[in-house]
Amino acid sequence: MQNNAQQQCTKEGKEMEQESRIAVMAIIVENRDSVDELNTLLHEYGNYIVGRMGLPYEKKNLHIVSIALDAPNETISALAGKIGNISGISVKTAYANA
């Protein structure tokens, strides 16, 4: 059974390559209890993730995660919106100009 992100990828087919954008999401995790929900979302969108880096920042008791994406703008926005709705997590997205 396909998840939502995979269904969108299948539906868009060849259009995905033409409309694809490169973006980086900066995610701040202040509530460790929300990590499972975040990881589930990232797994759902795994087809679009180019790379991921997580940094624990013990001094401030938080974690910093950066995600590099190659996906249609709508997919990137949908993922950012879902991540932003998770309690204790904030996200910002930067897009490449090209």
Model-predicted segments: where are they?
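Long, contiguous binding/interaction regions
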Residues: 2-98
